[in-house]
Each structure stands twice: as C-alpha cells, then as structure tokens.
C-alpha cells in the first residue's frame, strides 16, 4: 500500500488520518510530501462564508442536502452547520430530497427536525426536475409552521 511506503520512507503515518484517503490517497500525498494540513470541507466553507456571523444574527437555521441519514454525521454539511448553530443556541431544521430509516441519529448532532422535500414517490430524474418547486414548498411550509408557533407564544 502507498500509505505503508510513506510510513517506511518518510516516517509519517497517514493511515489513520481522516481525509487522507483509503490506503493513502491524494490527501496522504499532500500531507507527506508538501506538509499540507487536511481540513474538512465544511470547515473551509464555514470560514469562507463567515457562517458563524450569519448564524449568530439569525433566529433559526435551515440547512440541507440530497439525503439526510446516519452518514450525515460524518462531516456532511447539515451536521457541520448544526454544530456552528448550536454554539449560539439556534434551532436547526434539515431538509433533504430523501430521509432514511436511521435519520434520527442526526438529532444527537444538533439537527432538531428533518423533513423530506418530496411530495410523492417518483424517479430520481423527476425529483431533480421538480427540485426548485419542492424545496420552495417545503421551506415555505416550514417557515409558516414556525410563524404559527411564534404567534401562539404571544
């Protein structure tokens, strides 16, 4: 394996570094030969967008991706956004094209509620064709529900 060659030659163990790649991929090469530091994608996006400032000033956070499931806890955007939001005690709602049976695990990682944007069963192509309308409708309904809740509180 490439990672073993790096370890033997350079005395750098990239085998257990998240993001280095299976058995030493591109991430491992950049670390070993160029001294690169690996960062998660959400960490880079958070910094580039100044996400903390935006979240600090909001009432609640809406985030999403194509599918929210147990894999979402492994560095995907919704859980990364939720992590920032929870620093400021903001409620987080996730939306996705699909949810799986194991989606409940994301609640342990800061996502308070999750919703699928799909209104009917169809093909992947149909889901993509209706994506704008489906996301708009789901977001509007979530916002309306939040407004109802806020009005009922006084």
Where are these regions (language model features)?
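N-terminal loops that bind phosphate or other acidic moieties
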Residues: 1-154
């Amino acid at each position: 394996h490439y990672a073993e060659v790096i370890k033997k030659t350079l005395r750098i163990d990239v085998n257990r570094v998240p993001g280095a790649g299976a058995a030493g991929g591109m991430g491992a090469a950049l670390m070993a030969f160029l001294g690169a530091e690996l960062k998660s994608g959400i960490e880079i996006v958070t910094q580039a967008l100044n996400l903390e400032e935006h979240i600090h000033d909001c009432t609640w956070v809406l985030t999403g991706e194509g599918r929210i499931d147990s894999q979402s806890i492994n560095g995907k955007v919704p859980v990364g956004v939720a992590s920032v939001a929870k620093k400021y005690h903001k409620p987080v709602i996730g939306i996705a094209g699909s949810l799986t049976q194991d989606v409940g695990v994301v609640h342990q990682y800061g996502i308070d509620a999750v919703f699928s944007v799909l209104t009917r069963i169809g093909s992947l192509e149909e889901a993509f064709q209706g994506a704008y309308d489906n996301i708009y409708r789901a977001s509007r309904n979530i916002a309306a529900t939040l407004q109802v809740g806020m009005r009922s509180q006084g």
